[in-house]
């Protein structure tokens, strides 16, 4: 008798973001995952394939307009692909429901509220979860990520710098007081809307 595999129920919050499309593509290839919820701030009835035509006939699932007081509580994990400040409104709702969260915004990348507020020039409204977040760089924090309820996905600039520098620093080849990083980004580096 074959045993049925239990699928991990996944939600994507901010489903119309470009990063969400990439998450969907990865998850669709995973045999143990079921995409159960696609939440968006957009109004109206539409499917994810209406926003991303490449998903037509692959994932024609409807998107749900997110209401903070009426979010699904039956998920195993949620990917939050919302802009900074907005993400921190949703993350604690899922954590309080016992749902693991991978936050793709910058809202949980710093463990100190004062550091976040200095660099992002805005108040952090969920400081109690800052020190619970694990920096989501598996090359360095793989074991912590496995156990984390909240993973703060690192940004592109820090990732490019850390991946190259970490082995050099840990082996004593580079001193941290004289590092200069010069990085550039294309127009799509800041999301769907031009900035």
What are these regions, as identified by a protein language model?
Residues 1-7:
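Short, Lys/Arg-enriched N-terminal segments with co-localized hydrophobic residues
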Residues 7-195:
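N-terminal Rossmann-like NAD(P) cofactor-binding subdomain of oxidoreductases
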